[in-house]
Amino acid sequence: MERKGSAAGAKGNPSPPAAGEGQRPPPPLCVPGGGGGAPARGQVGAAAEPAELIRRAHEFKSQGAQCYKDKKFREAIGKYHRALLELKGLLPPPGERERDSRPASPAGALKPGRLSEEQSKTVEAIEIDCYNSLAACLLQAELVNYERVKEYCLKVLKKEGENFKALYRSGVAFYHLGDYDKALYYLKEARTQQPTDTNVIRYIQLTEMKLSRCSQREKEAM
């Protein structure tokens, strides 16, 4: 899934999401049953090098993309979770990240297990793609878990505040959860990214109608 794109893909929208949403490189074929070809992190031990963990995470993410294209959404969700599991613990908390950005020596050598700047960016990009893709998969369910969609989208926005798809889907999730003020906020933020997107415009109109009705009921109750 590209991190910029149309709002198509939310439940009930006029048009479905683009296949393979959330992935950059052409993915390999999905292996049914969750095997994936890459060993689970625990199978090789905690001493695996960051580069190997990142490689495996990217492989699982790519397999998830293929599963999404094949409309195997449950399998895709499993692949994206496996990708995130590979990356778990690689990035330090935000406070420590600033300290880690300083060179470990005058030569700028990295301590064992510490990520390079390029690796850190790669890890964050994979995490963003996986969370966006998980939200896209959940929105294909017959009964959508909008609370979980919201959770994944907010994780993306914490890392990349102007991510269009996460902004739009956050708005959709808040709309269906009945929090129309927050829905309108995120939808308007999405509109600043793509002012002509028809799905964003439609959900803004729906949200404003809900807010208007709520306001009218409050006046009648006074």
Curated annotation (Swiss-Prot):
Keyword Phosphoprotein assigned: yes
Residue spans of the TPR repeats: 56-89, 125-160, 161-194
Keywords noted in UniProt: Phosphoprotein, Repeat, TPR repeat
Pfam families in alphabetical order: TPR_2
Residue numbers bearing the Phosphoserine modification: 105
InterPro entries: FKBP4/5/8-like, TPR-like_helical_dom_sf, TPR_2, TPR_rpt
TM region positions: none
GO biological process terms on file: bone development
Cross-referenced SUPFAM superfamilies: TPR-like (SSF48452)
Annotated segments matching region Disordered: 1-49, 88-116
PANTHER family the record matches: PEPTIDYLPROLYL ISOMERASE, TETRATRICOPEPTIDE REPEAT DOMAIN 9
Family in the record: Belongs to the TTC9 family.
Protein name per the record: Tetratricopeptide repeat protein 9A
Taxonomic source organism: Homo sapiens
Gene name of the record: TTC9
